[in-house]
Amino acid sequence: MVSCNDASFSALRIKRAFLRRTVLEARKDVMSNQVSISTANIRGAFGGFFIPGMYTALWAGFVPYLKAKLSIGEDVLGSMILVLGVGSCLSMAIAGKLVENFGCKKVVLLASFIGMLSLAIVTMCSTIATTTAALFFFGIGVGLSGASANLQAILTEKVSKKHLMGAYHGGWSLGGFAGPYRR
């Protein structure tokens, strides 16, 4: 006798197997150069670096204000930045699985949204605890966007047979210049 839970578990296993198969087929197509590349793919991968570069630069410029606003010393600020790094490392550990299940584009968009939203929340926080929690989520956005954008860049570079990685990372730097820019 099959229970409802067994049936839903089987359906989930079938869905995961299908997703894994399609991702593996896509990887084989990329490796055998059976996939064409468009300028939209290249621009999308560039944007995947530009946007995180922008909000990371905004964060860097915001650190002195945050320190003064919360009246904290370097030790507390260092601990808060450590929490940001922990969020980033944890998200990098699962980024490959997320990309495998949902694709680079969706993961980069989600990560950019998480990064920008959490940075906006950091600016509104008035306590150390809430700011630290928001920085943890900011780290998640930074880590996810970095790992998934680099994976997309690698795939795009392999298909196009051009050396694009320097240009993509240049996009991160351009985002860093554009982020804190004010007229």
Q: Where are each of the predicted segments found?
A:
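Paired small-residue
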Residues: 129-137
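Intracellular juxtamembrane helix-capping segments at the cytosolic ends
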Residues: 144-158
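C-terminal ends and interior cores of transmembrane alpha-helices
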Residues: 113-126
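Helix-breaking motifs and short loop linkers at transmembrane-helix boundaries and internal kinks
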Residues: 71, 103, 124-129
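Pair of pore-lining "gating" transmembrane helices in MFS-fold secondary transporters
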Residues: 38-62, 136
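Helix-to-loop junctions at the C-terminal end of transmembrane segments
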Residues: 91-103
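Primarily marks hydrophobic transmembrane alpha-helices of the MFS/SLC 12-helix fold
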Residues: 105-108
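Short hydrophobic/small-residue motifs within alpha-helical transmembrane segments
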Residues: 85-86, 173-174
